[in-house]
Amino acid sequence: MFFKKKKNIPDGLWQRCDGCKSVVYKKKVEEKHNVCPECDYHFRVSTSERIDITLDKDSFKEYWNDMMPADPLKFMDRIKYKDRIISEQEKTKLNEAATVGKGFIDGKEVVFGITDSSFIMGSMGSVVGEKIARAAEMALELRLPLIIVSGSGGGARMHEGAFSLMQMAKTCAAIARRQDAGLLFIS
């Protein structure tokens, strides 16, 4: 009896689809912008992948990345809020759930924002609200289109209490000012 020598196949070539459970070639998934070639299931797209897919190559300039959430309530559930933030930053390589800045789409300048559900479910805390409001204000001042890709699902961030609830009013007011000016807003 003859046995063929087993070939070494590098890791990361294949992935299982959460939709149809098929094992699919990862390169095919990437070619379809993280969509399963078998069933059209949409895989999660990270912040950096979404920026790369949406904006012209290397055109994104991030703003306000140094903003860090405060812990005014000294909130604690299973762990302290400040420790949760550190853990989320290490896990996601993001400072917060929102990333905003300017970039180009087909050579046209836009203000671009994205919220990432992998960072505390993309919930809106004080930093997320401030970044979105500033992005809307910058787009209004520069008279640029504002595009926000919302990966949020977490609502207001309970760890910051009323501070996070106030962000909804702040962001809505900033976006309303843009709308009143008749500028393009896509979300």
Task: Name each region found by the language model.
Residues 1-186:
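Terminal-region recognition feature
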